[in-house]
Amino acid sequence: MSQNASVGIVTPQKIPFEMPLVLENGKTLPRFDLMIETYGELNAEKNNAVLICHALSGNHHVAGRHSAEDKYTGWWDNMVGPGKPIDTERFFVVGLNNLGGCDGSSGPLSINPETGREYGADFPVVTVKDWVKSQAALTDYLGIGQWAAVVGGSLGGMQALQWTISYPERVRHALVIASAPKLSTQNIAFNDVARQAILTDPDFNEGHYRSRNTVPARGLRIARMMGHITYLAEDGLGKKFGRDLRSNGYQYGYGVEFEVESYLRYQGDKFVGRFDANTYLLMTKALDYFDPAADFGNSLTRAVQDVQAKFFVASFSTDWRFAPERSHELVKALIAAQKSVQYIEVKSAHGHDAFLMEDEAYMRAVAAYMNNVYKECQQ
């Protein structure tokens, strides 16, 4: 399906919101910006809009290229575009960079209007609820009364679920992919180790590293390297790299010897070049705090009791970060609450990252579901 046409050259838009946003922690952003991209056309009935919510390291650039010279397309270009599962010839698709991000939306790199300086570590901790609240403001700005679908993988899937709970009347369908109704203890532990790598980097400077012309590159690199391991499946990693060495024989030192070591260093270095450490801290805390059942006596069934959306839930067989059993929890709760849900477990060797990759069964399942969403738009 990815051989079909791309959305082409796209231009991001920064949308200013000159209004306060009260956050879940009680703090208030006096104003905020959201960076977005849109693909396709909103129909006259305004009932064909689809919101794409990104995962930890994602952003608004879902599909296409920003210039003809761009080496890479958007992070979900195989999913979003003409003739693709989320078809931009049928749907008006919106991608955004969440609050706390580092790609144009208000976050640690933004100017604090109260001080005239970058927020840095002073940018408040944000939650999935806060993101959805800001996305609702964007929905109003775009003149959309109800999303045909809210779609997301991993942390993005958590946002899709929260949308159905916070604004049940504004979502017709939720596609929750490779996600979970809350993080496991192990995942919280992984996130804390990643944060400690950043927080203990001597160049972190209590989060105000940019004002001191430093970057906690070592900590962010290690955080990404460890995170990247958890996104991959052991078998897939073994088949790709095995125990292959970069040169003939062991070097009997502590440099890079195995191909897998070289790969992880490359991924870490690349990440440091495009991502902000404070944003990484914020995103992982949003993951940790997400637990919609906590507001309903720790009952996920009660949490989804009032949702009006129909659900598509997908998991991947080798995803051990967000294992299929976590999706089963959501599916069981939806069934217990007598909600409409379709579920698929995709056999894949790619672990958690499979939701970003082109798997025929996965793509066909999403395409079939979105085809039915489109048919509803025509009624």
UniProtKB/Swiss-Prot annotation:
Top-level enzyme category: transferase
GO biological process: homoserine metabolic process; methionine biosynthetic process
Ligand binding (substrate): R224, D353
Site entry: Important for acyl-CoA specificity: R321
Pathway assignment: Amino-acid biosynthesis; L-methionine biosynthesis via de novo pathway; O-succinyl-L-homoserine from L-homoserine: step 1/1
Residues forming the catalytic site: S154 (nucleophile), D319, H352
One Gene Ontology cellular component annotation held by this UniProt entry: cytoplasm
InterPro entries to which the protein is assigned, alphabetical: AB_hydrolase_1, AB_hydrolase_fold, HAT_MetX-like
Keyword Cytoplasm applies: yes
Pfam name, any one: Abhydrolase_1
Keyword check for Acyltransferase: yes
Catalytic activity: L-homoserine + succinyl-CoA = O-succinyl-L-homoserine + CoA
Localization per Swiss-Prot or TrEMBL: Cytoplasm
Keywords: Acyltransferase, Amino-acid biosynthesis, Cytoplasm, Methionine biosynthesis, Transferase
Domain AB hydrolase-1: 48-357
EC number in record: 2.3.1.46
Subunit structure, interactors included: Homodimer.
NCBIfam families assigned: homoserO_Ac_trn, PRK00175.1
Role noted for this protein: Transfers a succinyl group from succinyl-CoA to L-homoserine, forming succinyl-L-homoserine.
Protein name, per record: Homoserine O-succinyltransferase
Organism of this sequence: Neisseria meningitidis serogroup A / serotype 4A (strain DSM 15465 / Z2491)
Organism taxonomic ancestry: Bacteria, Pseudomonadati, Pseudomonadota, Betaproteobacteria, Neisseriales
